[in-house]
Amino acid sequence: MADDSGTENEGSGCTGWFMVEAIVQHPTGTQISDDEDEEVEDSGYDMVDFIDDSNITHNSLEAQALFNRQEADTHYATVQDLKRKYLGSPYVSPINTIAEAVESEISPRLDAIKLTRQPKKVKRRLFQTRELTDSGYGYSEVEAGTGTQVEKHGVPENGGDGQEKDTGRDIEGEEHTEAEAPTNSVREHAGTAGILELLKCKDLRAALLGKFKECFGLSFIDLIRPFKSDKTTCLDWVVAGFGIHHSISEAFQKLIEPLSLYAHIQWLTNAWGMVLLVLLRFKVNKSRSTVARTLATLLNIPENQMLIEPPKIQSGVAALYWFRTGISNASTVIGEAPEWITRQTVIEHGLADSQFKLTEMVQWAYDNDICEESEIAFEYAQRGDFDSNARAFLNSNMQAKYVKDCATMCRHYKHAEMRKMSIKQWIKHRGSKIEGTGNWKPIVQFLRHQNIEFIPFLTKFKLWLHGTPKKNCIAIVGPPDTGKSYFCMSLISFLGGTVISHVNSSSHFWLQPLVDAKVALLDDATQPCWIYMDTYMRNLLDGNPMSIDRKHKALTLIKCPPLLVTSNIDITKEDKYKYLHTRVTTFTFPNPFPFDRNGNAVYELSNTNWKCFFERLSSSLDIQDSEDEEDGSNSQAFRCVPGTVVRTL
């Protein structure tokens, strides 16, 4: 028998077979969880009271019903807040059904989804509008009273007898359906359809004008004067806005006050919401487009829902409307009323504007040295805001005649005043109209630049200034761009002289300006001009009286005023003009006129410098004031307006 395995040295210890039993907790490949204790035995006690099988009492049922109702209300309010946030129109409007109407037009498929059953009548409508029960705004009595039915029942023209019978049955069914529907819902649908139809109309302005007249009882055109261009600026504007949210009406006064000097605000309520009528005077002139953008931002409405025009400032009816409504409790007024309202509503102003006086207009033109008709008309019309006589002029139908008469009389007065003055008085008179002192040195420096001795020039200039016979004509000759015309034009500008041109020599009246001139200039005399002067003007250059032909007037006998001539031809070098050598004093300007790097003249020959020149050299030119005139002139200022006697008590 073979040896038993594992039995060596039998008898010395444990011998024989023994049984080993292993305990397997997890089979091979089993994943052991880290967060659970696998050794804990599940006794089943944690499943106790998992299901509540206790008796339900009456009080617990009421609490559960109350909790369910509160949860439902909370969910409903949350849904409504989301609807207001995401389904609202871009402009806040009290007409809340417009939002869903716009939504249905943008997405017809979304509008077709219905959770409630609609009546059969809806299928026959072309446009369907829904009611927003959660809008928060109710329909006013005006909307309920003016609501009209949207569709009219009728029989199709193309249908036969059978179709007519079916249509009749459908109409009868619809009538029963309408009887079941609430009356308020029909009115709301009708009002919404009318507003949508208005917004879709081609002439929105006409619809707004009609609604304005319906609300305020007068036409918008009666208060305004229309401007065609949106870029024309004006200080006063009349604005009518429609469909404004009621919350804006409370804050509009505070919003518009920093932008305006005067505001007349009226608010009314109609089926479209709040309607605004406001007369504004801004701090600066604004155009219609600027006013529209500003108020569209303040009122939160589109620009096409506003009527914006300037007020009718010459209408007494319009001024009376703003005045009467301003003192009533229907309006809010900010600031002082414009002068055009006060002028037409206060009795004293009305009496002062009743009669126009031409003498006041002539006196104004004389004082401001304005003799041109167009300038008189424009400048005097600008005074209509504060001058009662100018307002009467604007209200007259003979403005053209008044302007012509005023210009004629002003020229007569000016001409008589000029002829009455000597050259010394005239230079002083012209200098008194120029402000500033100036500097006489640039004139002397320019003469030296042209190689002209100042003392001989001053002697001959004195004889020319006083109109000495055969010495009352000075010719400045030389090459081009030497400053001849610049020198003579600056002198004529200071002395208030006139300019004649040989280009008009074909006319008999080209010498007519010499009649009304104290000094004169003939610029750029050419060869034909010198020939004409040598042929016809010798007696005139001698300083003797000469007859001048005037247009539409008789011949006038005048003495030629001091005459300046500029030319590129030196008559002293040509023998054919020998008869003019003794009648014309000639100075030559040989050097070009200098300019600096910036293109400015080096020698400034301005009116202020000429004023300083005559004041500085008055004794050399024999135009200084006498001892009797040093204290001022004794003559009074010219007045063509009759004086008034003040009667004291």
Curated annotation (Swiss-Prot):
Protein name: Replication protein E1
Subunit structure: Can form hexamers. Interacts with E2 protein; this interaction increases E1 DNA binding specificity. Interacts with host DNA polymerase subunit POLA2. Interacts with host single stranded DNA-binding protein RPA1. Interacts with host TOP1; this interaction stimulates the enzymatic activity of TOP1.
Top-level taxonomy: Viruses, Monodnaviria, Shotokuvirae, Cossaviricota, Papovaviricetes
GO molecular-function term, one example from the UniProt record: ATP binding
Sequence ranges assigned to domain SF3 helicase in this UniProt record: 452-602
A Pfam family it matches: PPV_E1_DBD
Residues the record lists as binding ATP: G478, P479, P480, D481, T482, G483, K484, S485
SUPFAM superfamilies: Origin of replication-binding domain, RBD-like (SSF55464), P-loop containing nucleoside triphosphate hydrolases (SSF52540)
Short sequence motif named Nuclear export signal, residue ranges: 106-115
Main location: host cell
